[in-house]
């Protein structure tokens, strides 16, 4: 049985041209279709929208049956991390560039959102990662990632020496520009550029993709999504760990980065006609003459 969607939350990217018109129009459309519409406080304040109730993100997730995110993939990454603990499903309207996560175009948003909220949808559960940095045995930083956790070099441009263990078992050491630890969702992001595999987003798996390793034998590996991945920085003159490219923490030699699956997945809702492979063909231009 499909879940009912009475209350719908709206979140819009603030600095996107045309976003105000899209947020207003979609809110009016949903209200006209009988839904209770709630806007994120910052979205409403930024655009000066006063004729709809507003909530902070925590309360928005708690009170909404679904949340529509208008923006690009970066906006969806940020909102997904914020709301993942609440279990509210997300619908993505693309007003960015790529649109792997926000797969519905503005031109089709009325029909697509109406279709989803009427119960005709494809639901995907996607895992997130939790990363912790330990220094001298004490936790000094932690964050979550929807796409990836990336250990990379900083401004000095020097290589990083890493030892990698999975579930307490040593796997290998590497000297490289860094390492991408990615969810299946993130395999079409930075990991793809680093030569990693494309993993179907509903799989419970994690890929480890070296960035410019100083060896000819290094290859990406895919492990269980329930694995505990431990990265030990044996030498790091200038290194950082990045979470979805939106949060970072400076690392030192001797630091340990522990990465596990986050406690709760995020659920994305797509129109009934959605196809992941069609998205790959469109976004990666498969089969087109270059």
Swiss-Prot record:
One Pfam family from the record: NAD_kinase_C
EC number in record: 2.7.1.23
Claim: NAD is one of the keywords in the record: yes
One GO location term (cellular component): cytoplasm
Binding residues for NAD(+): 73-74, 147-148, 158, 175, 177, 188-193, 246
Cofactor(s) annotated in UniProt: a divalent metal cation
Cross-referenced PANTHER family: NAD KINASE
UniProt name for this protein: NAD kinase
EC top class, as a word: transferase
Any Gene Ontology biological process: NAD metabolic process
Source organism: Thiobacillus denitrificans (strain ATCC 25259 / T1)
Active site: 73 (proton acceptor)
Principal location: cytoplasm
Highest taxon listed in the record's lineage: Bacteria
Subcellular location(s) of the protein: Cytoplasm
Family annotation (Gene3D superfamilies): Probable inorganic polyphosphate/atp-NAD kinase, domain 1 (3.40.50.10330), Probable inorganic polyphosphate/atp-NAD kinase, domain 2 (2.60.200.30)
Record family assignment: Belongs to the NAD kinase family.
Function of the molecule: Involved in the regulation of the intracellular balance of NAD and NADP, and is a key enzyme in the biosynthesis of NADP. Catalyzes specifically the phosphorylation on 2'-hydroxyl of the adenosine moiety of NAD to yield NADP.
Reaction catalysed by this enzyme: NAD(+) + ATP = ADP + NADP(+) + H(+)
UniProt GO molecular function: ATP binding; metal ion binding; NAD binding; NAD+ kinase activity
Species classification: Bacteria, Pseudomonadati, Pseudomonadota, Betaproteobacteria, Nitrosomonadales
Keywords annotated in UniProt: ATP-binding, Cytoplasm, Kinase, NAD, NADP, Nucleotide-binding, Transferase
């Amino acid at each position: 049985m499909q879940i009912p969607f009475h209350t719908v939350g709206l979140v819009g990217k603030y600095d996107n041209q045309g976003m105000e018109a899209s947020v207003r129009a979609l809110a009016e459309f949903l209200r006209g279709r009988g839904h209770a519409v709630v806007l994120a406080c910052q979205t409403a304040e930024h655009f000066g929208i006063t004729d709809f109730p507003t909530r902070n993100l925590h309360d928005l997730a708690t009170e909404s049956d679904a949340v529509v995110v208008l923006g690009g993939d970066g906006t969806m990454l940020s909102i997904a991390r914020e709301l993942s603990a609440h279990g509210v499903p997300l619908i993505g309207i693309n007003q960015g560039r790529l649109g792997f996560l926000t797969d519905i175009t503005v031109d089709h948003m009325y029909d697509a959102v109406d279709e989803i909220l009427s119960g005709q949808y494809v639901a995907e559960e996607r895992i997130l990662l939790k990363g912790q940095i330990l220094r001298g045995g004490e936790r000094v930083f932690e964050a979550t990632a929807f796409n990836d956790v990336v250990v990379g070099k900083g401004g000095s441009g020097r290589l990083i020496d890493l030892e990698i263990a999975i579930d307490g078992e040593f796997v290998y050491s590497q000297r490289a520009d860094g390492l991408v630890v990615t969810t299946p969702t993130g395999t079409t992001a930075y990991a793809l550029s680093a030569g990693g595999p494309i993993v179907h987003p509903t799989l419970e798996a994690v890929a480890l993709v070296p960035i410019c390793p100083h060896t000819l034998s290094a290859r990406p590996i895919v492990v269980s999504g329930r694995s505990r991945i431990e990265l030990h920085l044996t030498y790091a003159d200038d290194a950082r760990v990045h979470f979805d490219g939106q949060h970072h923490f400076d690392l030192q030699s001797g630091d340990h980065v522990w990465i596990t699956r986050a406690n709760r997945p995020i659920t994305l809702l797509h129109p009934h006609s959605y196809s992941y492979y069609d998205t790959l063909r469109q976004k990666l231009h498969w089969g087109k003459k270059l």
